[in-house]
Amino acid sequence: MINREDLLKNPVEDIALRDLEKYSDIVNVFDKIYGFSSEGIVRGSKILKEMIKDADLRFLSFTANLVSTGLRGLFADLVKRGYFNIIVTTGGTIDHDLARSFGGVYYKGSFDIDDAMLKDLEIHRLGNVLVPFESYGKVIEEIVRKFLPEIAKDKKEIPAYELLWEFGKRISDSNSILRAAYEKKVPVIVPGIVDGSFGTNLFIQSQFLNFKINLFEDMRLIKDLVFSCKKSGALIIGGGISKHHTIWWNQFKDGLDYAVYVTTAQEYDGSLSGAKPREAISWNKIRPNAKHATIYGDATIIVPILAASLLS
């Protein structure tokens, strides 16, 4: 029988852009190699650089699983440095960011550990990341119970993005995405905010606090940003609701001008997650003349490469 302590030895660590400085020219290496997936990385890097210079509305869209990894700190740093000015993500992002901001520690594990054993040891498994029970649900519940009453005292109804700024304001962890978003006043749009521990705890506490989230105000904000921008671009990591919400709203301005997809999903099953940018063109979500690229691979490998290239 494996002891719990034997599994929870090596914590996941957040990275920042400074950790990637010595790799800033790595895309030039891929440019020389060129063949097969390397070309996608090179093309995506070039588009991303041009997008950041040219587009005034720059979306960072990603799925929550990545926030359990060291990419969390990198996302926060990209926001702090001004590369992106709006985030679209999922409810789990809030869970992981809050949990890790207030003492929750995630650990390096394996895809192959016995899950029944992990359950007995009170450890969740997220891919090869291990999340002790005490580092997740309990932490989030305590945070919401602590902070929501003082937030609700002044605001009985609040847009979700403002609520997330309020939580970000109360975070001191420099690796926090919510903290970075609050400091830079970057809206974090979470269309599925009720889907997760944070959303569930908001619902429970709302029964006692007469507190409501106004998601229509989030829609109004993203509408105003899209309609008022000259050009928009997006780095879309993964699929699902965060990908769709990003491209959905851009159809109302005749589509994104720039789009870089990082994905492992395939298009043969007709899924939104696997759909390539060219399909979005048919829906008016990406302009026919837009610059776009699809990079296939694990985001924990691809995203640091793209981020490093921004420093060159």
Curated annotation (Swiss-Prot):
The keyword Iron does not apply. GO terms for cellular component: cytoplasm. One of its GO terms (molecular function) is deoxyhypusine synthase activity. Its cofactor is NAD(+). Its EC number is 2.5.1.46. It is an enzyme of class 2 (transferase). HAMAP family: DHS (MF_00153). Belongs to the deoxyhypusine synthase family. This is Probable deoxyhypusine synthase. It comes from Saccharolobus islandicus (strain M.16.4 / Kamchatka #3) (Sulfolobus islandicus). The gene is dys.
